[in-house]
Amino acid sequence: MRLHSAITLRNLFTRKSLRIPQNLSITASPLLIGDVSGQIKPSSTSHYSKSSLSEASSSSSSSLIFQIPNNASFFLENQRRYSTGSSSGSPPDVNKVVDEINLKFAEAREEIEMAMDAKETVYFNEEAECARDAVAEVLEMFQGLLGKVTEKEKASLQRSMGLKIEQLKAELEQLNE
């Protein structure tokens, strides 16, 4: 291992100085093995798991400990938060509701399509009622969201989702004819 690589590793993972023996044979594992049964357990509750790198020769018993990021928790904590341009603390809630509305929108369109396919059958009334309920749920969720957000967010939501909502209303009208 070159010296500048060791410095890079020190700065990236441990922020501590490293002792590197001259004749090093490395065996690395991202997790420590807990017992003889083979169960693998993380070494601590921190965001990093320890991996020991030990020398294969029996002449020296020195070992190195590097901290390697535990990818799952490291990713979740450093995940970007996307917002709708608001400076308030509600963007994750708004995004969650928008995702739910989009999901319900897709379900409502499927219900309308199934009702249109059953137009001249005995199942039409049931399918049409399910489609009306699904559209009503989407419209209720969208209006509820518009009532909870600021004017700036409301305008943004109208621009991004208004056309889809109008499309849903038009498809429902077409079903009712």
Swiss-Prot record:
> Which residues constitute the signal peptide according to the record?
none
* Ranges in coiled-coil conformation: 98-118
Q: In which tissues is it expressed?
A: Expressed in flowers, leaves, stems and siliques.
Q: What induces it?
A: Induced by cold and salt. Probably repressed by HAG1/GCN5.
UniProt KW keywords? Activator, Coiled coil, Nucleus, Transcription, Transcription regulation
Q: Name one GO biological process term.
A: response to cold
Q: What is this protein called?
A: Embryogenesis-like protein
GO cellular component terms given for this protein: cytosol; mitochondrion; nucleus
Traced from the root, the source organism's taxonomic lineage reads: Eukaryota, Viridiplantae, Streptophyta, Embryophyta, Tracheophyta
Q: How the protein assembles, per its UniProt entry?
A: Interacts with HAG1/GCN5.
